[in-house]
């Protein structure tokens, strides 16, 4: 995390923002967030991130005044400049700062906004994948939403790490592949590229959307065992870009030459063009 952050439109020292201890955010994790890649000092796919943030906020009935929401992009650009970021990442979190009615009689309704930035994530060059024993409920109210309730994702990843893996495939209640613990999934069979359908309950990732717009890719519903016959498997997110998996359980993969791995140069070029 960088030295300066933004909390409710004000610059603060990173890590010192204060929230209401009885708020729905603190007690129940009521909030949504998005993580944005920064290339050449510019946030990448900002429009997509803001659209998802607005959509996810509405889904959990978190209502921020339009004027404040519309100022988020400008605030982020100011923070990027202040922290002198060339390449990095940012996280925008909107959370319910209203005290929970279960614990407080009266409270002013409000939505807090925290924006932080950091250097690019460091990812192992030797990524190992397994299958998580923890399933996703595709019919749950938070399915497909990037909410602050990320404990299940973290626990699934911790379980995989305890077994010596870096990430894990998570299936839904029907046994269909949805995603990795903290990323979307893509895989190659021959020259065909695949990814789980949104109907599985997977997150509608912005990087996922960008890939679907720029590559010939089929959205499918398959069981986890289907990926065992894949030629290559990739995980994607704004924080890590595109990373090829080197191993799925005991099976090892050779390096792929698929142009999907050129996503970051493509992203950087598109970011520069949008800034001109």
Residue ranges and their predicted role:
Residues 1-78, 95, 100-276:
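Helix-start/capping segments and mature chain N-termini
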Residues 81-94:
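Ordered, amphipathic secondary-structure segments that act as subunit-interaction surfaces
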């Amino acid at each position: 995390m960088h030295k300066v952050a933004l909390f409710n439109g004000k610059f603060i020292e990173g890590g010192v923002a204060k929230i209401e201890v009885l708020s729905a955010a603190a007690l129940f994790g009521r909030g949504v967030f998005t993580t944005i890649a920064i290339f050449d000092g510019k946030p990448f796919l900002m429009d997509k991130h803001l659209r998802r943030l607005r959509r996810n906020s509405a889904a959990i009935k978190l209502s921020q005044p339009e004027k404040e929401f519309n100022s988020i992009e400008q605030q982020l650009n100011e923070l990027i400049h202040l922290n002198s970021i060339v390449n990095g990442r940012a996280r925008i979190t909107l959370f319910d700062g209203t005290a929970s009615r279960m614990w407080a009689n009266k409270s002013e309704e409000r939505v807090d906004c925290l924006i932080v930035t950091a250097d690019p994530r460091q990812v192992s060059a030797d990524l190992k994948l397994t299958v998580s024993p923890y399933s996703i409920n595709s019919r749950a109210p938070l399915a497909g939403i990037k909410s602050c309730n990320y404990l299940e994702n973290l626990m699934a990843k911790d379980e995989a790490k305890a077994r010596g893996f870096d990430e894990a495939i998570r299936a839904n209640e029907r046994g269909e592949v949805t995603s990795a613990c903290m990323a979307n999934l893509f895989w190659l069979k021959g020259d065909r590229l695949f990814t789980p359908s949104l109907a599985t309950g997977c997150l509608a990732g912005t990087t996922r959307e960008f890939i679907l717009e720029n590559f010939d890719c089929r959205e499918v519903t398959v069981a986890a065992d289907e990926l065992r016959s894949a030629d290559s498997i990739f995980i994607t997110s704004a924080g890590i870009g595109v990373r090829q998996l080197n191993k799925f359980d005991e099976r090892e993969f050779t390096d792929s030459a698929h142009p999907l791995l050129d996503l970051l140069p493509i992203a950087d070029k598109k970011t520069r063009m949008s800034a001109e």
